[in-house]
């Protein structure tokens, strides 16, 4: 049965929330800090960045000299990796205040757009916009990271992800539409190519591993492209599991740019349901374990005449593992919160500028924005709970850290950002 085309109108939205601009407790922060001998955060001759606005961050890392595009965190150690427009990746600690600088990774030919540790924590995989992939091996318990291997198979990499459960495994997509999957040798860090796929005719814009709960004998990936195709792959054989084209989506043009895997708690144990969003506002929900059956297809926004076409672009998608909720974030600043049991919009949040990333965590929805803020909402009520402020340019990425168990001290969650002005800020989430 064909899915019904649905247009979300303002009448269908139960509640619209416009976040407040001010934060209750604005704490000014001295960004210059003190030059501590063992801090290694800033050289005396470096010019400090002046942030002329309120700032409620705990601390900061500012060694990048250009935009910070990517941020990743080690699965076990308090270690952050950030990648920037300065063609560098930096390692630094997430538990100390201020952060302790732990090393710089060099050898990139362009901006570093992905920093990802492997699931077991033994390797760090980074990628840049010149098509380079560098693999660093952790030594001395993760205190040192040594270059183990590198490759350059494509002109430009768009995305790279490590597998969440299979050790030493990663995949990436390129601007020529190609898809690649590799496994890292545990002993020496050398690379074994598992597959390469050449089905997409335009940029392979995003990828997501699926069926990650099935053990190490199942290695499957779904990718999407600006050419309106969505493809699922068996990464061990390189075979296509299915391919969705414009014909399967009513002939609509859908330059896909975002992908998100639904948690099994929402899908009765099916770990192959994904949502895919396009840069013209089309949303598709697909069952990858049923030949790519389309469960839902809709246009999420009706643009006003004065709006730009890209205002409808779905930049980020996130599913709640606790409630029947899914959120999508648009370039126009709207966040639509869907009730996944009925595919109706339960809430609409309106931010001041483009949404860059969404993340559910327990009862909360976190959203980063080009206005330089990260918002914390109560996912069920839509109530704004906290706003991270301190950037004077956009937040391009962020991670959320949970307190380490059994430390004996009461700790709070932390938001760590990747800022367009070259700074990462560390925030403590008060509740």
From Swiss-Prot:
Pfam families: WD40
GO terms for cellular component: cytoplasm; cytosol
Repeat positions for WD: 63-102, 107-146, 149-192, 199-243, 309-348, 350-387
UniProt-listed SMART domains: WD40
Highest taxon in the source lineage: Eukaryota
BP GO annotations: ribosomal large subunit assembly; ribosomal large subunit biogenesis
Keyword Repeat applies: yes
Entry keywords, A to Z: Repeat, WD repeat
PROSITE patterns: WD_REPEATS_1, WD_REPEATS_2, WD_REPEATS_REGION
InterPro entries: WD40/YVTN_repeat-like_dom_sf, WD40_repeat_dom_sf, WD40_rpt, WD_repeat_multifunction
MF terms (GO), sorted A to Z: unfolded protein binding
Subunit record text: Interacts strongly with QSR1. Part of an oligomeric protein complex that is loosely associated with ribosomes.
Function as written in the Swiss-Prot or TrEMBL entry: May be involved in the late step of 60S ribosomal subunit assembly or modification in the cytoplasm.
Entries under PANTHER family matching the protein: ANGIO-ASSOCIATED MIGRATORY CELL PROTEIN (PTHR19857:SF8), MITOCHONDRIAL DIVISION PROTEIN 1-RELATED (PTHR19857)
UniProt miscellaneous comment: Present with 19700 molecules/cell in log phase SD medium.
UniProt protein name: Ribosome assembly protein SQT1
Gene expressing this chain: SQT1
